[in-house]
């Protein structure tokens, strides 16, 4: 699986963590293990890196890339960090990294449905569990769509966009990432 990850602000992250060779560090969003590999390279056998990710693709790639180092990758969201680390017996820790947002792998992998550049099923799930974006836009109420767009997308035109999505899905369900009719209807509002 192709999973390219160029870590952003790598030197700043390493400086900020002030890595001790025998320290315990957590990457709460391990992804392609770009940051984690560089952290783990600086650890001795007395140190440890624990990587978290809810994306099974990322867990598989990171596990392979971190195999030569004192590192463990777990398939959990970082919001479960305290519980998981306590169960592993590795608290307290010396540093935590969270590189938040959608990864380039998720954007580049057509089947994930995040890309605006490729036609794909409308998925947009980080962990491949739960409701897909297709199910969401075709089933939730206009009010709930508006709340989601406003809360998570910080979208000031959330009500208008939700209204247009509901109108569009009444004509024909929305299935693909490149179905532009909803965007075209909403764009006139911004023009």
List where the protein language model places each region.
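S-adenosyl-L-methionine-dependent methyltransferase catalytic core, i.e., the SAM/SAH-binding region
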Residues: 1-187
